[in-house]
């Protein structure tokens, strides 16, 4: 399946990313190869092969769901450089958020 440069540009715009025309072409080629490889997996005969759900031979160990007292809020905020009424203030990294 061929991924077009327009599709790469569309997804990049949704992700608020900008690429040069050369980078966009390279991504389109690379993504097309990846999709082709994944499509090949669909052609593999898996008759008689048991489904694999995990590669780890571990059982999930869950702790009891017990309410515990948390850490003191003032102690947590002791080293926070900028705060406002128990909210941590951080620099903005997005302009207006856009309409992704």
From Swiss-Prot:
Enzyme class: ligase
GO biological process terms held by the UniProt record: glutaminyl-tRNAGln biosynthesis via transamidation; regulation of translational fidelity; translation
Transmembrane region(s): none
Catalytic activity: L-glutamyl-tRNA(Gln) + L-glutamine + ATP + H2O = L-glutaminyl-tRNA(Gln) + L-glutamate + ADP + phosphate + H(+); L-aspartyl-tRNA(Asn) + L-glutamine + ATP + H2O = L-asparaginyl-tRNA(Asn) + L-glutamate + ADP + phosphate + 2 H(+)
Keywords per UniProt: ATP-binding, Ligase, Nucleotide-binding, Protein biosynthesis
Enzyme Commission designation: 6.3.5.-
InterPro entries for this protein: Asp/Glu-ADT_sf_sub_c, GatC
Gene3D superfamilies linked to this entry: Glu-tRNAGln amidotransferase C subunit, N-terminal domain
MF-aspect GO terms: asparaginyl-tRNA synthase (glutamine-hydrolyzing) activity; ATP binding; glutaminyl-tRNA synthase (glutamine-hydrolyzing) activity
Coiled-coil residue windows: none
Name of one Pfam family that matches: GatC
Function: Allows the formation of correctly charged Asn-tRNA(Asn) or Gln-tRNA(Gln) through the transamidation of misacylated Asp-tRNA(Asn) or Glu-tRNA(Gln) in organisms which lack either or both of asparaginyl-tRNA or glutaminyl-tRNA synthetases. The reaction takes place in the presence of glutamine and ATP through an activated phospho-Asp-tRNA(Asn) or phospho-Glu-tRNA(Gln).
Protein family: Belongs to the GatC family.
Assembly and interaction partners: Heterotrimer of A, B and C subunits.
Protein name: Aspartyl/glutamyl-tRNA(Asn/Gln) amidotransferase subunit C
Naturally occurring in which organism (per UniProt): Streptococcus pneumoniae serotype 19F (strain G54)
Lineage: Bacteria, Bacillati, Bacillota, Bacilli, Lactobacillales
This protein's encoding gene: gatC
């Amino acid at each position: 399946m061929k991924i077009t440069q327009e599709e790469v540009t569309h997804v990049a715009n949704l992700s608020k990313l900008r690429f040069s025309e050369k980078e966009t072409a390279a991504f389109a080629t690379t993504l097309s190869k990846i999709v082709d490889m994944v499509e090949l997996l669909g052609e593999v005969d898996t008759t008689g092969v048991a489904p694999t759900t995990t590669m780890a031979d571990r059982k999930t160990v869950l702790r009891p769901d017990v309410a515990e007292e948390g850490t003191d809020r003032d102690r947590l905020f002791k080293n926070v450089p900028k705060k406002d009424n128990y909210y941590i203030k951080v620099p903005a990294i997005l302009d207006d958020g856009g309409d992704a």
